[in-house]
Amino acid sequence: QDCPLDPGRFLQGLKESAVKKGAQFRYHCVVQEVGDGTVLLEGGEEGAGAEVIVAGGAWTDSMARSLKTRIPLQGGKGYSLTLNNPSTLPRLCSLLGEARVAITPMGDSLRVAGTMEICGNDLSINERRVQGIIKAACRMFPGLTPGEFEGVKRWSGLRPCSPDGLPYLGRVEGREKVLVASGHAML
């Protein structure tokens, strides 16, 4: 059974728990090299730990190249819009299979998301696809109107998609202290 959650809040809680246990996070930096228990960042900063987890989403393959390992992934772009205090707020999640749209209540907000566009690592917004998501949501939930979506921030993100649809989870061969966690696509 699917159940709603706020991904931002979930990840914040997960991060806080990991930091309490000694994990370190680095954002908006370029990984030059991943070694067995070490990471070299652009600019020379080096990090070391008991283990390194390579979880770079659609960019995991480029991060793992210094390990002499190929992790074939392709970015699958999806879009979402979040309405605060919408005119209609369903109590349950809905997956609109034919339209490939998900409707998710999150407290007093409603997240409307969908599509899968194989696009490399292009995060640009295709407004035609966004309008398709809005149209499907308004068709299935007549209380919603296209006007409610005017001025609402359009968001795009990349799902890391593996060729067979299965995630990469586990240790890198020959590297005792390096794990990969990526390729989860729509799981």
Named regions from a protein language model:
Residues 66, 86-89, 107-111, 117-158, ...:
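Flavin-binding catalytic cores
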Residues 31-34, 101-104, 169:
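A structural signal for short hydrophobic beta-strand segments in well-ordered beta-sheet cores
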Residues 1-15, 58-59, 129-136, 183:
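Mid-domain beta-loop-alpha active-site segment that forms a flexible
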Residues 1, 7, 97-98, 138-187:
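C-terminal catalytic lobe of FAD-dependent flavoproteins
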Residues 42-90, 126:
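Central helical "cap/lid" subdomain
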Residues 48, 93, 100-102, 168:
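Short, surface-exposed charged micro-motifs
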Residues 72, 121-128, 177-187:
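A conserved FAD-binding loop/helix module that cradles the flavin
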Residues 1-43, 47-50:
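Helical element adjacent to the flavin cofactor pocket in flavoenzyme catalytic cores
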